[in-house]
A protein has these predicted regions:
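Active-site bordering "gate/hinge" segments
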Residues: 1-203
Length: 204
């Protein structure tokens, strides 16, 4: 077995574990609060959302926590591990007026602990954003259709970059030569108007 011989088919994997600079805490968010404290967070979101606008008829809030450990064991370098806490809090509100119903949604979280959600009016701000979106949707009219120029801001439009560029940069696609970016390191692959920065160390 691997554990018995510290090798796999003759490949030595016993090279120790190298520590690098931590980008986030390694504590487990799952046990950072008890069940009643977690429920209280959802109760606060519910109360805040309903207090912001009398048209809010339903509030749905969710809280999830994970604590993931990843170990990378190359054959030619020291092993490295990543311990990442992940917290996700979301709230969705249903607003109704004159027979019309609209929904607003907002979420927060990241590689943080649960107590971060209670700082700086975070819960109230989250509820306020969900209610704001629902309110905007209540007054919304059908958007114009057809071909037009658009400007994408920061945030969710990043999903478009992920799909259009991110998957094409994956190692397997480039190894097999099936990516549009294969063999183009150092070459321009987009228009002059397009600049994409991928840096996992940028805060938030």
């Amino acid at each position: 077995s691997i554990s018995k011989g510290h090798n796999c088919n003759g490949i030595n994997i016993n090279k120790g574990v190298k520590k690098t600079n931590a980008l986030y805490v390694s504590d487990d968010p799952i046990f950072s609060m008890n069940r009643s404290q977690k429920a209280k967070i959802l109760e606060i979101l519910n109360a805040e959302a309903r207090a912001l606008d009398p048209r809010v008829v339903q509030v749905m809030a969710g809280l999830s926590c994970t604590h993931r450990t990843t170990l990378v064991m190359p054959t030619d370098n020291p092993s490295r591990y990543d311990i990442k806490p992940m917290v996700h809090l979301s709230v969705s509100v249903v607003m109704e007026k004159d027979g019309r119903r609209e929904v607003g949604y907002a979420s927060a979280g990241g590689a943080i602990l649960l107590d971060e959600l209670l700082k700086n009016n975070s819960l109230k701000d989250l509820a306020k954003e969900a209610v704001r979106i629902a309110s905007v949707n209540m007054e919304a009219i059908p958007a114009p259709a057809g071909t037009m120029t658009v400007v994408l801001g920061a945030g969710w439009p990043g999903v478009l970059v992920h799909e259009a560029v991110g998957h094409g940069l994956e190692g397997d696609f480039n190894r097999t030569g099936s990516s549009a970016f294969t063999g183009k390191i150092g070459q321009k692959v987009a228009s002059e108007a397009c600049t994409i920065i991928d840096d996992g160390t940028i805060p938030n």
